Amino acid sequence: MPLQSKLALGLSCLIATAIAVLTLTPVPAPPLGSVAESDKIYHVVAFGVLAFPMAYLRPRWLMLAVPAYLAFGGLIEILQPFVGRDRSLGDWLADLIGLGIGVVIGLAAGRFVPFARPRMRR
């Protein structure tokens, strides 16, 4: 398997694991008066970071990766009530927005900053 493929898969698995741990860990209720929508930025950033490596290193795999990432975000929302957290369509939509941003940035980075490939020795 080429290095780019290993990096794309490895980083995606690592980031997805971090997202799962952070979103499925029970947390105390936010203090009264806090803005309930403030966590949306975390969803956007997390799923943008999740999409970036695949978009940058293996853009052809996005046709499979993006639906898998969306299903992953949906599964997290389904499971959250079992760990004392709230299920939210808004969170899943924030995941979708983050994926879009991560894909756009990853594709742009891949176009303008190509992955450094070691030269073959002759």
Indicate residue ranges for each PLM-predicted region.
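Bulky hydrophobic segments
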Residues: M1-W92, L96-R122
